[in-house]
């Protein structure tokens, strides 16, 4: 039966990497050992909760999610966590054997979650390829040059 399984999913954004472990549970979510509801940075917390809000309370109450995230900045980590949770939820409810009624129902939930995530924001499931441009020789930053003086 597909319900007892554990799914490990990853999400990346810039330099941040998040690994989510999703297992059957009661709807608890931890980010680096801190419950999501009391995560200190509010904007990051709201961003991380997006996949759970889109999925709905019915789906959230079926799973426990533990996420380890490292690297990058605050919002990069939030986007990585968001991607890991969204990918993990889609994978958790996916089922290949379609002969069982429960399996068909779970597979429908997985397809509905996938389309809902893609309609809301494509980067929940698909990575964002943009990266920071490296600094060039004899420049202040990637594009800015020294100020030219004519006098």
Curated annotation (Swiss-Prot):
Key word Ribosomal protein present: yes
Record GO terms (molecular function): RNA binding; structural constituent of ribosome
Record-level GO BP terms: maturation of SSU-rRNA from tricistronic rRNA transcript (SSU-rRNA, 5.8S rRNA, LSU-rRNA); translation
Pfam families in the record: Ribosomal_S9
Position of the signal peptide: none
InterPro entries, per the entry: Ribosomal_Su5_D2-typ_SF (IPR020568), Ribosomal_uS9 (IPR000754), Ribosomal_uS9_archaeal (IPR019958), Ribosomal_uS9_CS (IPR020574), Ribsml_uS5_D2-typ_fold_subgr (IPR014721)
UniProt keyword list: Ribonucleoprotein, Ribosomal protein
UniProt protein name: Small ribosomal subunit protein uS9
Protein's organism: Aeropyrum pernix (strain ATCC 700893 / DSM 11879 / JCM 9820 / NBRC 100138 / K1)
